[in-house]
């Protein structure tokens, strides 16, 4: 069941804070994956992700929420340190990393401001909502920019991504600790349905076998959740009466 080549992992947030964090993580990964802007396709993916990230960052107190979570994780680790047999050096190392991330995040300029003030991103953002609105005749500035020497383009992009490093580093360690807080455990759904108590968790992680081709429809919040398994082929696919899968409530 744990064979990664024959299974697929799904994650589902159980609160709005986690929903925002997962979206930010996805967008930051997109920016990193398409940082080599050597063609229009990579460039548009990069700038669309940058535009989406600006929108996400403007919707809430991202810095405040992350700082609170960094502190919460430090407190949890302190409790672990008092348990006999725990690797105290590892716990101390993680706590120091959390403190370091918090200090950097606290002193960083307004998160996302560099993206928002970037002229090229601003110009491209105005055209993203228009179907086909990023043609060279619509965006001659982008067309010229893409024909600049790669060193010049890279310097521009590296500066933008460096401004996001405090956010990226804090988010990464937080999500890593949350994901590692609970192991995947074997479960069985009956007639395509499973439900349980969430116990104040932030995140559901679910690993399914690739065959049969199913996907989970998840609803829930911090106290309770329900999962319904549906066939990818809604007309001809079937859902087993008993389905084995793995689940973690983090």
From Swiss-Prot:
Compartments in which it is found: Cytoplasm
Gene Ontology annotations of biological process type: division septum assembly; FtsZ-dependent cytokinesis
Gene3D superfamilies per the UniProt record, alphabetical: YacF-like (1.10.3900.10), YacF-like domains (2.60.440.10)
Disulfide bonds: none
A cellular component annotation (GO) from this entry: cytoplasm
Keywords: Cell cycle, Cell division, Cytoplasm, Septation
Stretches assigned to coiled coil: none
Main location: cytoplasm
Pfam name, any one: ZapD
Self-association and partners: Interacts with FtsZ.
Database matches in NCBIfam families: PRK05287.1-1, PRK05287.1-3
Family: Belongs to the ZapD family.
Protein task: Cell division factor that enhances FtsZ-ring assembly. Directly interacts with FtsZ and promotes bundling of FtsZ protofilaments, with a reduction in FtsZ GTPase activity.
Protein name, entry field: Cell division protein ZapD
Organism of origin: Yersinia pseudotuberculosis serotype O:1b (strain IP 31758)
